[in-house]
Amino acid sequence: MDAKFLEILVCPLCKGPLVFDKSKDELICKGDRLAFPIKDGIPMMLESEARELAPEEEVK
């Protein structure tokens, strides 16, 4: 994920910053504890596409 692109992307719900998880190909919102998938290089930034992080999942 391009660092400049990541700087301008925010969580569509809380407008907070996102963290790129390369191993799972997801963008993580720490505030809402949501993971937005990246499919074919395109972030799926819809709440309906996001998954909730499990309590044991650590956000880096």
From Swiss-Prot:
It comes from the Bacteria. GO terms for cellular component: cytosol. PANTHER family: PROTEIN PREY, MITOCHONDRIAL, ZGC:162634. Belongs to the UPF0434 family. This is UPF0434 protein CV_3345. It comes from Chromobacterium violaceum (strain ATCC 12472 / DSM 30191 / JCM 1249 / CCUG 213 / NBRC 12614 / NCIMB 9131 / NCTC 9757 / MK).
